[in-house]
Amino acid sequence: MRSLAHIDQTNDPLPIVILGGGFAGLFAALHLRDLHSGPIILIDQSWSFVFKPLLYELLTSEVKLELISPRYDELLHNSGITFVLGTVEAIDLEQKQVKLNSGLKYSYRHLVLALGSTTSYLGIPGAKEHALSFRTGYDVFALGQHLRNRLQIATQTEDIEERRALLTVAIVGGGASGVEMAATLADLLPTWYIPLGGNPQDIQIVILQRGSEILKESTSDRLRETAQLELQQRTVSVGVLLESEVKAIHPGVVEFERSGQLERLAAATVVWTTGNATHPVIDSLAIAPENRDKHKRLLVKPTLQLPDFPEVFAGGDCAIEPLNPQPATAQVAYQQGAAIAHNIKALINGKSPTPATVNLRGTLMKLGMHESAVEIFDRYEIKGQLGQAIRLATYLELMPTPARNFVNRTGWFTEEILKQIARV
């Protein structure tokens, strides 16, 4: 293993290269710019940052696209950070070089891996072809257009079975994403269907969950109970099929197994909210198997460094610290980005990096239009419109955009509530 002294105490003119412009990567870059005057390169395959927690609000028109998906060239204007639009093809950790599919190559002094995750369809036939994903702004508009089209066709068909299928939405996965999607659509679809002359009670939204309960690993028992209750109290009650394993997805039909029996659900809309896979480039890294977890994520030190490559840091969905695992959320990735920046600066100054600390405010979950449930410090729960206000203010506080103007007006509100609760 190479020594830290050899790596970090030289006047190396090479840049710090950051792969991935999500929360971990973007905020590592922005914090580094405040700490370090040398060259910084941020590489992403998209022109725009995507604030994924607020994609539901984009679908419901509660926020606008420019708020949650600002362009990198606008975010980084006059920052001194170089943005490169490109797709990473390979990383040579020994030679300390990144290659893009365009043929461009970048040697680095320090490397930040923040490529996130990709959708895994778990080998289920037809899932990739016939289910809609929900990860980008494009996905939001595609889903919205698809749903509006199905609602319009439903008002024109005389066939009862066809109408039932057109008005049925199957959501695969009962984790946080699936529950938030179901609650959002249960309030949203009636607002689209009623003006067309439709009866909102004809709309059916069903969660297909392979496990024995929803939100099994992502929330407390109390928040899970709140979510279950809220799903029933939406404008359209949400159905939940537990222990239902999807076997195949065909055009307009989902096949699933429940209690040993194969069943079919006619649904013109299938939304895929389960299954994450590591980025292909992360998969291809020359990393020993013992330095990956069972999901192929990179195991990192408490300092967020790779064990055998101390000049390389990793954060966000593609990495996990085994002694202190954190949920794959925006709150965590944002703080990891800041920690990575400070540790890179420490190495450049010939100092030892320090363990990253992550302070979670709580769990934030959207449970319908204009409503959320917020569990703070794992002790206090606030829901409804007040919960939504706290959720929005908390998320928008992270945004390096004009959203901060909103936070300047409302951030005090969130902080004061948190302080008051902490005193109880």
Spans of model-derived segments:
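C-terminal, flexible cofactor-proximal segment of oxidoreductases
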Residues: 2-4, 332, 336-424
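Short glycine-enriched, charge-decorated loop/helix-capping segments at active-site entrances
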Residues: 55-63, 128-132, 222, 286-289, ...
